[in-house]
Amino acid sequence: DGVGPHNTAASGRKAYTALSTKNDTQALAVAARGNPDMANLTTVPELLLLGGGLPLRAKGEVVGAIGVAGGGGALPDRACALAALAAVPELDSPTL
């Protein structure tokens, strides 16, 4: 697949961020740029506010998360995560 080991760490942090905040990491990144209180989240070492992390929901409940890294940037990583969610019919469609 050609990605470096740092992408494994980044994908894990994106998944952790999506799970712990119950939010799309791309949305968090955008919010952090415009809100000083949200920007404080960037100082939490475990969190990574870059696109590619999505919470997984089934019947409205968060049941896990996915994190994607190494796809060429935050938006391609997010697109890959969305495609993965779409392939699992038991999961709710994410709200965009």
Task: Mark where each language-model region is.
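Flexible, solvent-exposed loop/hinge segments and secondary-structure transition points
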Residues: 1-96
